[in-house]
Amino acid sequence: MKMPLMMRMHRDFPPNAKVKQIGISCSHRKYFVSFSVEYEQDITIIKNPKNGVGLDLNVCDIACSCDINHHDKLTDFKQYQTDMKELLGIEIDEEVNTKRLIPTYSKLHSFKKYSKEYKRLQRKQSRRVLKSKQNKTKLGGNFYKTQKKLNQVFDKSSHQKTDRYHKITSELSKQFELIVVEDLQVKNMTKRAKLKNVKQKSGLNKAILNTSFYQIISFLDYKQQHNGKLLVKVPPQYTSKTCHCCGNINHKLKLNHRQYWCLECGYREHRDINAANNILSKGLSLRAGNVHARL
């Protein structure tokens, strides 16, 4: 029996689009319909290759090689500084050029998922499951009520993060014809530490996985293609340790050093912004046929 169903559309189809495939998915008793459509899009050659930006993806923020227009749309940076300090105890340097940093809020979203209340309910659920197995009884109604609360918190946090990444990537794709990112190998970045600092490394691994670098890059990839623009991936080696001015590599630079200071030429800059400048330079040199290119 065929029956009409009410649904809420996220956005209209592109003009002259043909629906090729329909997919139905269910997540925690919520149903979603996705449409695969085919339509024509004019792809124009990049007019101004210098209108590019290098992005250094980090756990707390995305560093850009140049200022971002309409930066206030993407974040309230003062509120971000307050939230990070009060909730996580992380202090953000006020002297940094904030128009080159876009907070991801990934730590704040994961904080909601792993808050004390959330963990308490998870432990409660585990005890209920263990008790039902020992007594060979069915799980009661309270178990499913609590699980529904946990699912709602997890879904809300996940949707907030995805929505934020969509807003960031859409604004970047709208402003820049060329976007250069690092070709990050998250699997290698999140390998377990050997012998020393195992606990510290596990915390860093969790933060990296919560940030979802691949999701950001995949959003940028398809949006750049849709807009007829270009996304370039470059090797990530020594982007943070190399001086953008003279090219000297500071091998003594550690992860907790947030300010880059070149011992050769005296150049000083925020560590991630220096890395973003190097990433853009690498991308421009690749497009120029491995010829050294600088801004």
Spell out what each predicted region is:
Residues 1-2, 35:
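Short, hydrophobic/proline-enriched secondary-structure or compact coil segments at domain edges
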Residues 3-12:
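Beta-strand/loop nucleic-acid-binding surfaces
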Residues 15-295:
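Positively charged, helix-rich recognition surfaces that bind polyanionic ligands
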